[in-house]
């Protein structure tokens, strides 16, 4: 926020010509270019999931990250930075995708019907239970992170921040009614329209009803 105090969204970064550092092959980047939200020449697909470049350039670039993780890490873990970073959500800039969905092959739906009938409510209850009391699960996540030792830094403080951030930014919550885990078909259609606008390869005959169901 100190580097670009007037920036609130991706269009502001576009207008300033700020480099956007992301992983290669990101669908949202192609969609944002098609929508005019970003310019193709400002996207740098060389992000390596480390803070090194952002810190070396003193925050002159923007980069992808998790709203539930990076703000904490940059302020509390990466001592070379040690201050706030500003964020804007993909969803708020025109990419309302559902993240981390549970998917099956349509051809297997009948075969898996009995299992899904039992399993999906467990998923739903786990979301509710976690956000009512996340301490035990957070401790397990932190422990597993240490055991994997794969380069990702995730502390107890980060886990606590993540829980609060998910609620603050609406990263988790009910669907269009009072049920957690169900999907808004209008939102699915918005994504299909965005994919078509960007000219991405897809089956043009698909409708939201072909892709999601709320029956479980």
Question: Model-derived features: where do they sit?
Answer:
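Secondary-structure end/capping motifs
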Residues: 111-198
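Long, low-complexity C-terminal extensions of enzymes
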Residues: 191-192, 196-216
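Conserved PLP-enzyme active-site core in the AAT-like
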Residues: 32
């Amino acid at each position: 926020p100190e580097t670009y105090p007037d920036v609130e969204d991706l269009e502001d970064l576009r207008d300033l010509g700020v480099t956007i550092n992301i992983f290669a092959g990101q669908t949202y980047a192609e969609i944002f270019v098609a929508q005019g939200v970003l310019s193709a020449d400002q996207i740098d697909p060389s992000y390596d999931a480390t803070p090194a470049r952002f810190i070396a350039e003193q925050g002159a670039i923007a980069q992808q990250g998790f709203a539930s993780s990076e703000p904490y890490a940059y302020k509390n873990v990466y001592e070379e930075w040690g201050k706030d970073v500003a964020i804007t959500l993909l969803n708020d800039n025109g990419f309302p995708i559902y993240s981390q969905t549970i998917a099956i092959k349509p051809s297997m739906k009948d075969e898996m019907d009995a299992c899904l009938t039992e399993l999906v409510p467990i998923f739903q209850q786990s979301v509710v239970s976690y956000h009512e009391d996340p301490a035990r699960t957070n401790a397990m996540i932190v422990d597993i992170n240490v055991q994997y030792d794969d380069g990702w830094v995730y502390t107890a403080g980060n886990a606590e921040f993540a829980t609060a951030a998910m609620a603050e930014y609406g990263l988790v919550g009910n669907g269009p009614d009072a049920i957690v885990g169900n999907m808004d078909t209008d939102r699915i259609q918005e994504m299909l329209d965005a994919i078509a606008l960007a000219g991405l390869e897809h089956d043009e005959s698909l409708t939201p009803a072909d892709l999601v169901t709320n029956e479980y």
